[in-house]
Every structure is written in structure tokens, then in C-alpha cells.
Amino acid sequence: LKERYLPRMLSNDMDELWRCAQFLTEQGAGSDVGNIEVMARAEGDHWLIDGDKWFCSNADAEVILLLARTEGAVAGSRGLSMFLVPRELDDGNRNHYRIVRLKDKLGTCSMASGEVTLDGAVGYLIGELNTGIKQIMKTVSLSRLSHGVRAAAMMRRCLNESRQGARNRCQSGQ
């Protein structure tokens, strides 16, 4: 998997770069990911994934990372595994999932968020079975930090723009 997917996921060449998506949320499993119902069943060297994801960030990306429950896994978050799901299969055909609807959300024009149905989509296990929650929490924790840093930078910019505007303001010719 690393040889096949990582070079394009990490490329600095925008013509070669594959965009990535994260599919976690389901209609009945928003903030409680332990309720995830999307199922993955082993099929040779890959897995077939079925179910619906609800708020899929960057839904039209070339590569998806998603959490699913494998057959026979324990209930709750300890039974979740992470899978890589390519948009296109090795034979050039599209994988077996479809974007049902794009969400009309404020502030996400550059990254479509949508509802996706997986109908036997081919996926590849990343890491070990039942470690998906640990893997995704590392990513989520890092993204929370970056959101905080961006918010602080935006506040500083707003303060600087306001100061500059106040210093250079003319009122009644003065």
C-alpha cells in the first residue's frame, strides 16, 4: 500500500498529487463514533465495505480514509478499523461507492462535504484490526491544534487591520 499510494498522497507536484478524504460520521454516529455501522468484510487481499457515511469531508477525493466495523468485531469504538478506499480501482474502473448528496455548508466551498453510500467498495486495511479509533484520534488531535493556530492567526490579523484602519481614519476632514 505504501508504495502504491503514498507517493501520490505526499507529492509536491500538483499534477501528481492525490487529494485525500476522511469519512467518519454516520447518521447515527456523529460525535459518538462507537456507533459506526458501516461494515467491512474480508475478501482475499482486500475488504468490501458497505454502508452510508454522512458528513464526508472532501467527498470527491482520489483516496479516502474511513472507519468501519469488521464482521465479528466488538461493539463500540474498540471494534473499529481504518481503511484506505481508492476512488479508482487498479483496472481503471470507479470503486463501488457514490456521492448521494453534497451538503450546502457555510465555509466549505473548497472542500465538498457529502453523503456517500458504499456498495461493496474495495478497501485496504491500514494498520491492525480494531486500532482505527487510535489512528484517527491522532489525526483529529493534530487537526484540532491546527484549527486553534489558524484561529489565533486570524484574530491577530483582524486586530492589526482594525488598528491600521483606526490610525488612518479620517472623520469630518480630520
What are these regions (language model features)?
Residues 1, 33, 43-46, 117, ...:
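Alpha-helical interface subdomain recognition
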Residues 1-38, 42:
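Internal maturation/activation junctions in enzymes
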Residues 15-17, 30-33, 41-48, 109-134:
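Active-site-adjacent "gating/activation" loops or surface patches in catalytic cores
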Residues 18-25, 48, 95-101:
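Short Pro/Gly-enriched beta-strand edge/turn motifs at strand-loop
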Residues 22, 40, 49-51, 83, ...:
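Buried hydrophobic positions in well-ordered alpha/beta secondary-structure cores of metabolic enzymes
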Residues 28-31, 55-57, 74, 105-111:
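Short Gly/Pro-enriched turn/cap motifs at secondary-structure boundaries
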Residues 46, 50-94:
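A short core secondary-structure module
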Residues 91-100, 112-143, 160-174:
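A glycine-rich, basic-preceded beta-loop-alpha segment at the flavin cofactor/substrate interface
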